[in-house]
Amino acid sequence: EGDWLDGNITGQGIAAYANGVTYEGEFRNAMHNGTGTMTSPGGYIYEGSWINGTKEGEGKITYPDGAVYQGNLKSGTRDGVGTLTMADGLVYSGEWVDGEIQGAGSLTQPNGDVYEGSLVDGKREGEGVATYANGDVYQGSFLNDRRHGTGTFTGTDGYVYVGEWAEGLIEGNGQVTYPDGSVYVGTFANNVANGTGKITYPNGSTYEGDWENGVINGSGIATYDNGLTYEGMFLNAQYDGQGTMTYADGYVYEGQWAQGQRNGLGRATYADGTVYNGDFLNGQRNGQGEITLPDGFTYVGGWQDGVIDGTGIATYANGDVYEGSFVRGRREGEGTMRYATGQESVGTWSDGALVSETGQGN
């Protein structure tokens, strides 16, 4: 029903088709041409421009599920620049090619996340900026709808990562600044430090070396704000294995560690020149060991809780030599003292003194 020209449907009119589709608008030579509205029984509605029976130019499509597209069409498909609003709240505004989201655009998710940048086949791909509903921001490369390549993630809590990504995860080389001000530079895997890297803490302390699954593990060097340094093996962020600890006052320990404590065989050199070689347990001299003091005193034998305890040989600065039992650093029990003069006392000792002599000699 409508206008005719020279026997052809041309001008304004209304057409109702056998399949239930209706069209109201402009015609030329019996084809939709110009501006018109097509309504399908299923709820699909197109309002806009037509050329020779094909949707072409500016138009608005309302889909049966409530989604709405407003923008350019070419050869009946979304092509050019347009905005799609989904019933669930998703909104895309940007470029389209052959009916697909393709090119530069802005994508707003129902939860409030917003992406602005390049898209391919409806997915984030190329350079873009994602602003999340909680305020976090990612700026960088995407591939197949995930962060991939190089990019910067800035969290509202102060966490900032700059570096490489793979399939949505922090992976490769990068730098992260933590909310407490600590800075890590190195390699990552599965979103955490993994491989080799250096962390610098706000107080100036540092660790440089191996990492595993976000934890200090392997070989590395730790420096502390009090001047202390440790170089050696770590396990679960504790000194464990072989390592050297150097204090600012000159004390140096080289040897075995376990769970952050000196444990096993080691060598301790003290600031005054004293040297101990032997066993340690829980950070204390314990077991068998040898100590040499700057004044010439030496002791070889048993230790417990950091002090001489057990059986051993003590050589004093004056040349006297005691061989026997010690308790808490004092001669205690059976022992023999060989004096520098050549005299010898054999017997029982208590609190460092001979209390019962069983033999003597020259």
Model-derived regions: residue spans:
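Intrinsic disorder/low-complexity segments
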Residues: A16-N19, M31, V68, D88, ...
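Short beta-strand elements of solenoid repeat domains
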Residues: E1, I14-Y17, E24, T37-S40, ...
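Conserved anchor residues at repeat-unit boundaries in beta-strand-based tandem repeats, strongest
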Residues: E1-T10, T22-N33, Y46-E56, V68-D79, ...
